[in-house]
């Protein structure tokens, strides 16, 4: 199973003060995804609106960004990734964004709620 994670949607699924330090929240999500992906042998791509400077990197998961930061740009990037996938039915998109869920679902991907993924990779 391939996972595509709507990064900021998953970060925002838990009101833990992430908005005070966006970079730390993104970095923490990446660390949690890395640990989970390596322990479960999952193929994970996390998508953000734009890269940070300096960029966040990982040797375990793929970190992707929209080509240009704009409203819904990460969503559009996720849809493009599902659309161009050889087997979209083998993709699980982690998001709670209703419009994004509808778009990727129409392409054959499965949607996994953001809060459920957050609880899976970072139990309270």
What kind of region is each of these model predictions?
Residues 2-5, 9-124:
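Nuclease catalytic cores that cleave nucleic-acid phosphodiester bonds
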